[in-house]
Amino acid sequence: MQGVWSQLWRKYADYKYNKFERFAVWEMIEPYRRPKTFTTLITIYVAAFYTGVIGAAVTEQLYKEKFWEEHPGKTVPLMKPVFYRGPWRVYRGEAIASDASSQ
């Protein structure tokens, strides 16, 4: 029975030493590692940007179709920004009157 315990303790000691050795080596190498790439982050940002562009195009097209159904043959006025509540200027064309002022 003494030999079994001795072997178990030896295996445990080897496991602990190897574990320490692995971490010690990686901690020494860490400053010389290549920095992590931003490829994944950039891919997500590009996908989000183009999703927004496509969403805006679809929203504007639906707005135009709805306006043409109600006012056939007329020029579609500019669409007011959805998520921007501050002042905005229009240099060419006319801005849409807000709901409160049109009543």
Curated annotation (Swiss-Prot):
PANTHER family: OS05G0540200 PROTEIN (PTHR37898:SF1). Keywords: Membrane, Transmembrane, Transmembrane helix. It is found in: Membrane. InterPro entries: At4g29660-like. Signal peptide: none annotated. It is a single-pass membrane protein. The chain crosses the membrane at residues 38-58. The keyword Zinc does not apply. This is Uncharacterized protein At4g29660. Its main location: membrane. The keyword Acetylation does not apply. One of its GO terms (cellular component) is membrane. It comes from the Eukaryota.
